[in-house]
A protein has these predicted regions:
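Asp-based, Mg2+/Mn2+-dependent phosphohydrolase catalytic module
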Residues: 1-6, 95, 99-100, 109-216
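N-terminal helical cap/lid subdomain that shapes the substrate entry/recognition surface
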Residues: 1-95, 103-104
Length: 216
């Protein structure tokens, strides 16, 4: 196996968004339910890069009657990444797993559906130096399960689909990978009753199980 493609959220890291969801609306001067309802509407465009984060905040401020205010957009972006970074943590098995792959010469790409804040989050958590590439939907212009984001990851790493293993907590995204001929592991942390998803992915309970697949 030449490469491992890893999802970010709930695969290698998790975030507690409580403070994020409490503080940003106060800073924006918008009720939390109104702000995050509008965030939900524009989330697909933020995720696939059609809308930048700055443009997204500007849209929300204008739509909710609090804009345009360029200085507030900047403040929201800065505070947002601060709160996101403070709330994020890696699962305990991530660093040893990634270090072990690098020691074996297995290339690593983080393949995430996300907005542009997540590059900073991965850097703050120390993931960036452990990976060969960050393949983010907002930069690629396509989100999982689209084949384009998987193809981009393979291209960046210089490996074939048959030489890669994809790990994600979302079975639909795993199916997107297997449709391209990439082996997939559906990571189900703490859910012993989960069944194998459609599409040929293998259910695993931890990254130790993934390591065993890479050795097979």
């Amino acid at each position: 196996m030449g490469a491992c493609l890893l999802d970010a959220f709930e695969t290698i890291l998790t975030c507690d968004f409580t403070t994020y969801r409490r503080e940003l609306p106060v800073l924006a001067g918008i009720p939390a339910d109104v702000m995050f309802e509008e965030f939900g509407r524009i989330a697909p465009a933020l995720t696939d890069g059609r809308l930048s984060l700055a443009a997204g905040y500007d849209h929300i401020l204008r739509t909710c009657g609090a804009g345009p205010r360029p200085e507030l957009v900047r403040a929201l972006m800065d505070r947002g990444i601060e709160l996101l970074s403070a709330s994020g943590r890696l699962f305990e098995d991530v660093r040893p797993f990634m270090a072990g792959l690098r020691a074996r010469g297995i290339k690593i790409a983080i393949v995430s559906n996300c907005d542009e804040q997540v590059r900073g989050l991965l850097g703050s958590l120390g993931v960036t130096p452990l990976a060969d590439a960050l393949v983010l939907s907002c930069e690629v212009g396509a989100a999982k399960p689209s084949p384009r984001i998987f193809e981009r990851a393979l291209e960046v790493l210089g490996v074939s689909a048959e030489a890669a293993l994809f790990v994600d907590d979302n079975p639909g995204f795993c199916a997107g990978a297997t449709a391209l001929g990439i082996r997939a592991a559906h990571l189900v942390r703490g859910e012993p009753g989960a069944q194998a998803p459609a599409g040929g992915a293998t259910v695993v309970r931890s990254l130790a199980d993934v390591e065993a697949m890479l050795s097979a």
